[in-house]
């Protein structure tokens, strides 16, 4: 299993929509390609690289990919693992709205707590 570690650089003012943070989206991609995946805060569009420090390596498939998420502002991030079908997502902090929403497979581990509308 290969692991990609992402660490939030700063706490978002608004909710940061992170539906790209899922093993299915990271699988088979380089760190540069992962950093280029989209996210948004309010009406503003960003890339994951704008908000997260990214290290490690993704697996060839979602099933071979683990994502570790760190940072003090994870409670302001939504849609972690949304639509994931395989792999593992580990949130070392609070997981908020729509974390693993529409999840079809894989594993979620939250090391602190869920907040609103998770799962």
Regions found by a protein language model. Give the residues of each.
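Charge-rich, low-hydrophobicity low-complexity segments
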Residues: 1-119
């Amino acid at each position: 299993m290969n692991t990609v570690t992402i660490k939030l650089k700063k706490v978002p003012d608004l909710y940061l929509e992170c539906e790209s943070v899922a093993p299915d989206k990271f699988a088979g991609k380089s760190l540069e390609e992962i950093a280029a995946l989209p996210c948004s805060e309010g009406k503003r569009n960003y890339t994951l690289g704008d908000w997260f420090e990214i290290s490690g390596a993704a697996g060839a498939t979602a099933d071979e990919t683990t994502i570790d998420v760190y940072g003090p502002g994870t409670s302001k991030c939504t849609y972690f693992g949304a639509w994931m079908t395989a792999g593992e997502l580990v949130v070392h902090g609070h997981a908020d709205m729509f974390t693993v929403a529409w999840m079809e497979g894989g594993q979620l581990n939250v090391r602190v707590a869920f907040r609103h509308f998770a799962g």
